[in-house]
Amino acid sequence: MKQDAGLGFRLWVESVVSRVLPGADVSEVLLPDTATKIYVFCVDGRVLFNLSDLVDILKCFGVCADSSQICEYMRSTGRVERLEQLKDLFGEEGLEVVCSSVFSDKLLQEIGSSIRSAKGPECFKDAGPELSHPRFSIGEYKFGCQREGRDGFHNVNELYPFNHQWTDSIMDGILKNIYTSDGKRMEDGCTGKERPAFIKAGSRGRHMKHSGSLKDRPFVCTYNDCKRAFKRYEHLKRHNLMHTGERPHKCRFPGCSKAFSRSDNLSQHYKVHSTTNEMHTRSYGSYRYLNKEFN
């Protein structure tokens, strides 16, 4: 299926349901504005989504949270069921799925509200649901809340680990609240004379080399004093994966367990899954009996 860029959450779900392959038990879906593929199941006339795919789906519509948070919320509200027909494939308990009929814009708001209330009060209300604490810091740039005065500054390692799920819109909200350690608002780039007091003396040369100014390269890696600075937040996110070894971009092709740190590498990998009968036999494995088009 082609991707549906620009649609709202419920409209996207309806589009997926309307284009499920007739007579197919499994259909391929491309998530909006991404190269990520998921597979939906059609059982007794209903279209079912894998619960574990929900975190990727919601991320496309602005709700970012851990998979465990989203799955637990869906289970607690009784929206999850077991797909008994696939016990042979997914074990005795079957596959946890969510029916497309429960997906709505209201559900999107419910999940976002649940995540915010679980994390605590917000200070940066216009920055997004992930900013749930009044003080955040990226790299050695300290972000304080206006309500806390000059003493409300902390380094990110003192409060939270690096969060690779922050989006650009969230970061824009953070950058609007930048303050130096003396309480002055950070609007201009740092210079040798007026550099922020919180920049360590030993790292000033490296900071100036990589960043030039806070405005030009405000996103700094703090992993083991790496201090690489980047102009765009997504570049910092991608760089951080080299330190953590994380591979968030997983191949959704049934039977394939490959994962990659970069989405472009995943897109390149998808080319190995050709549409020949030989590749279907090798890659789809036990999925073959589910859909006549796979044989």
UniProtKB/Swiss-Prot annotation:
Quote one Gene Ontology molecular function term: RNA polymerase II cis-regulatory region sequence-specific DNA binding
PROSITE patterns from the UniProt entry: ZINC_FINGER_C2H2_1, ZINC_FINGER_C2H2_2
What Gene3D superfamilies does this protein map onto? Classic Zinc Finger
Annotated InterPro entries: Znf_C2H2_sf, Znf_C2H2_type
GO cellular component terms, A-Z: chromatin; PcG protein complex; transcription regulator complex
ZnF (C2H2-type) intervals: 219-243, 249-273
Which Pfam families does the record match to this protein?
A: zf-C2H2 (PF00096)
Which keywords has UniProt assigned to this entry?
Metal-binding, Repeat, Zinc, Zinc-finger
Q: Which PANTHER family match?
A: TRANSCRIPTIONAL REPRESSOR PROTEIN YY, YY2 TRANSCRIPTION FACTOR
* Stated name of the protein: Zinc finger C2H2 protein ECU08_0560
